[in-house]
Amino acid sequence: MAANKGINGGIKNHFIAFLGEFVGTFLFLFFAYGGTQTANQTSQKNPSIVASPDINQLLYIALIFGFSLTVNVWIFFRVSGGLFNPAVTIALCLVGVVGPVRSIFIFIAQVVASIAAAAAVRGLLPGDTVLFSCALAPGTSIAQGLFLEMFFTIELVFTILMLAAEKTKVTFVAPVGIGLSLFVAELMGVAWTGGALNPARAFGAEVIGGFRGYHWIYWLGPLMGAVLAAGFYKVIKFLNYEQVNGEQDLSAEEKQLKDEKKARKKEERRRKQNFAGLFQTGRMHHHHHANTRNATVNDAGDGRPNSAPPYTEPPAQQQTWPHSASTIRENEDFSRFAEMGSQDGIVITREQPAEQYRLSGERYVQDANAQNRAKTP
């Protein structure tokens, strides 16, 4: 039952994305197609293509495409992502933002919606000619048109990847940047290629208005641009481009979380270093204490020191010194002090105040020798 519920939930989500993308693409292209038809119909009586528009037409068409995309992306990005473009869908699939199955649903929705939008504009606006098809301007070769569409699409797709796919503090205004990027590309593209940047935009218009022999450039050009934009995006992500500009893209909450994470790591490293240092200090003190005691006895084994008065084992009451809750004798292992920390690892002689000494085998030996010399007649 759980598996079936998960499968049904996935299908439901794909259907919602399909529906949102269909409606969003339809509205985007309906107003874009309609605006282009309006701009061309007022100045030309019988054109079959959009070719060599004057500056007013160019600005009008670029603005209607840019604003229509901005508004509808802002509406539908919460539902389906607001892609409205098969080239954008493929780019997001390549970088891993949209899954392959979801991409198929969205791709189909975009193509079907483009046909529906073109049919709606054709049927609702007066006139018998489709004036919103994409076509190459006179003198523009097919190769030129192909690469122009590629570069126009790179601009649009890379804007989407950096503003929408990358989650930063300015993601909520990404639709503005996306619409502006389309507007910029249309300012140049409308005059030379019709400014498709979108296979669905070109396909829907030509289904209603008739296909041209070079229609394929409006598929291949944008797809090439999408792949190149996605590839460049992957390269800079691999190179960790975020480190170049520091934390300027982080919100206040993200900066606080990052600072807290750094502080925790720093504290953890400090604790590990302190513990390792205390452990090593305890071992060194233990070995130094044993070596110093051995050095006070000569090689003959008679118990007399090489350059000091004879060593006499101090009485039991002089072998002890205060230490927290227990009494530690001379032959006790000093290495265990490493686990007590700086507070519990205090070693002193009976004659000295506790706050003057810390754990030190060398100091203990010096004090013990001084006491023995003082007691030797």
Curated annotation (Swiss-Prot):
Start-end of Polar residues biased regions: 315-328, 368-377
Membrane protein topology class: Multi-pass membrane protein
Sorted UniProt keywords: Glycoprotein, Membrane, Repeat, Transmembrane, Transmembrane helix, Transport
Induction: Expression is higher in conidia than in vegetative hyphae.
Pfam families, sorted: MIP (PF00230)
Any one GO molecular function term: water channel activity
Positions on the Extracellular side per record topology: 36-56, 109-144, 193-215
Subcellular location: Membrane
Description of the deletion phenotype: Leads to a slight reduction in the vegetative growth rate and a significant increase in conidiation.
Substrates-to-products reaction catalysed: H2O(in) = H2O(out); glycerol(in) = glycerol(out)
Residue positions of motif NPA 1: 85-87
InterPro entries: Aquaporin-like (IPR023271), Aquaporin_transptr (IPR034294), MIP (IPR000425)
Cytoplasmic topological domain residue ranges: 1-14, 78-87, 166-171, 237-377
CC annotations in GO: plasma membrane
Family affiliation: Belongs to the MIP/aquaporin (TC 1.A.8) family.
Known function: Water channel required to facilitate the transport of water across membranes. Involved in conidiation.
Protein name from the UniProt record: Aquaporin-2
Species whose genome carries this gene: Botryotinia fuckeliana (strain B05.10)
Gene field: AQP2
